Amino acid sequence: MLAYLPDTHAPAWATVLTEEEAHNQGKALVLGWHEGRLSLWPPMGRETPVAVDFLQGALGYRISQGRVKHERLVKAMGRLPNNSLIVDATAGLGRDSALLAAAGFEVLMLEANPVLQQLLSDGLLRLQGQLPLRLITGRAEDILPQLTPQVVYLDPMFPERKKSAAVKKELAWLQYIAPIPSHGEEANLLKIARRAATHKVVVKRPANAPFLGAETPNSQLPGKAVRFDVYLPIS
């Protein structure tokens, strides 16, 4: 479903094609360079490519001084000790991680998908340390037991229908490379996260979505489109 363009450092397992070849062979997406950023887009399509850019565009506006403190995600973290570490165990494109880092938290991103890992790494390279963001590549289920963060943040992919056309497009692209986790996988990740966190686990969910892993949270920050479910640690 995915092809790497020849100008990328493609891993050994990847299919390397030109954009025209990818289109002719029915590949859904290509990974390549667009305007100096490693990006994802449909071959020969007109859609805007997806890249990780922590300081530009809509995300750059949201993390600007004086705005980020009003983000509901930041409010969901509550009061935390100084120098608190937040682990974003489902980093994706890193946007929520950037908001938390801009709010003053130390943020460690975990990402298992190799394509998203490359996009995040490129974004971090261009960020040049301007936000306290780090990335560890690998499965959160394997890495979290080795960490003791104050907060673990989870935002598992969810097939929400009431999204804008642009968000639906991006979500569809991501689902080609990172399928939606099963109920059992979600429940297991939540349990591991609650054992790792010292203060809380914060889960982002569509407002009308079921609880992650069918586990009732200890508290909630509701919203019209998105809510944040808060879980206390378990031993």
What positions do the PLM features span?
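Short, polar loop motifs at secondary-structure junctions
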Residues: 6-9, 92, 204-208
